[in-house]
Amino acid sequence: MTDKMIDLHGAAALVPDGATMSFGGFTTQRHPMAFVYEMIRLGRRDLYLFGHSPGGDWDILIGAGAVKRVELAYEADEAFNTVGPRWRRAVERGQIEWEDYSNFSMVARFTAGAMGIPFMPVRSLLGSDVLAKETLLPGERKADPRTAARKSHVMTSPFDPRDRVVLVPAVRTDFAVLHVQKAAADGTLRFEGQTFADVQQALAADTVIVTAEEIVEADTLRREPERNPIPFFAVNHVCHVPFGAHPYAVYNYYDYDPVQLKEYHEAARDDASFARYLDKYVRGVRDHGQYLEAVGGRARLDMIKASPACGYSPELKRRRL
């Protein structure tokens, strides 16, 4: 089997300016944050992001000036903020191009891309302002081959004239970047807990990069093939990055870090304090190891360690510190 192992810096360096991307995870769960920070250190620009429910992975990239356009349903860190602060600021200032969908319709778009079909029918947008409003103009869409020609299309069912559905365009990206609990060097992956839309996003991407808490033997994972929903041949690169989702949670490994998330959201409200945050935790550290030391090292990481019985930390103070 091919050895697909690569270091984090080398993996992030594969992504050029202007790439189309999706990131795995959901709000405060299992985002590939170490990879995101490495892209910021590399100075990436003009990225096109597609997602259903991203969190601070998108927010910090947007704040760092790395993103040109997003197509999404929601971007926030649940209990810490209803809308990502840098995302909100970028929209209010007209600094980012964006298009709005529902959660289900974005997952349907990834599913269409994974299946190799041009669109997917859904009902979830009917009767909503999401369907009625389109922020990307037809001229912008026509001029950019990375953007669908239309946001959506309502059609009458060819099987029942009383029935209507919405067609949403497929999403295919240059890169999908996921963080998982376990991976093998050949690209075999193990998700523990919810997969969210990671499987669809991976199969809808030309290149799949995975960061993992643990690297294990492929034969170990193959003993339970039903728990490996992405085929090894769909994965291009694997990085060993313990605590690679911090400050977000990885089920069975660690909870999200409320101290760090609180610090981020307080800093991200203001341009100057956000710049200081980036300097302290991203641009001012050499690599992921230095980042973990900067946020508090072993003492902080032990604080968020998951209980073997629960898969998360039941003792963690989650909101008001």
Functional labels for PLM-detected ranges:
Residues 1-321:
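Conserved alpha/beta enzyme-core scaffold
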